[in-house]
Amino acid sequence: MRQNTIALVYDFDGTLTPKTMQEYTIIPRLKLNSNKFWADILNEANATDGEIMMIYMRQLISHAESVGIKITKDEFTFMADKIKYFSGVKDWFKNINGYIKKNHKNIKIAHYVISAGHHEILEATSIRNNLTNVFGSQYYFDKHGNATFPKIVVTDTTKTQFLFRINKGKEKFSE
């Protein structure tokens, strides 16, 4: 079967932004010392042979509770505005889409982000309207809208699953 769609897939942290999304958002919000926080995560992962992203997401909830902050979707949406992008990122999508439209009329471009970062933040970023879909780690939110545990965890190794999903057109987790 001949296809005419090119999927451009980006990581987020360090690819579209100079720092991780957490450095712009949740870490300052919780007033954490970034170096100490990440060192504690790595120490726990090494001591327990645990998955770093699971430990990180659980620790965020614990830290938030200890300072009286509820992690909610609204909180993540608010924090997304604080993200800074590399120079040219915001123009990139318009420029590449325009180039393809002008020079290759039978080709379509689809832009995706696959990130270990927070899906809820990715959904609220200023570049989201340029993206076909975003994949990231997600929390389960209880009936009060509070994050209670990691629902979906994206790691460096699970990112390949999302490439497969994009290729097969199965972008929902229930598929």
Task: Cite the ranges covered by each PLM segment.
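Alpha-helical substrate-recognition element adjacent to the catalytic core
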Residues: 1-147
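Conserved acidic, metal-coordinating active-site core of Asp-based
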Residues: 134-175
